[in-house]
């Protein structure tokens, strides 16, 4: 559904649609060498509490720790497909620092040649919806 939405948005905005596909990030079946990868990682979803208040009681610390580990593995796996000079956009819908800034800081510390170009976190009133986090990484 998200990929379809991206295609529809690109068409509506009269933008060239980039190559889009859905794959397991653990073993992405990439053809060619992508210059930019958008990584919308599985997360705790705590930025959606306004719409899903039950998450407050459904998410356990163990589940969140498992998601942080999964995010780490996905970042490491996908990074290897990026060419020198390529970009990786890392996106979550959580406000949990361990899944956001903490994840990116740890990635930068263990990954030579990775740099942070920009990061942002939406505020509750910025879009009138979910809290989102994003980081743009560049490979040297």
What name fits each language-model region?
Residues 1-140:
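S-adenosylmethionine
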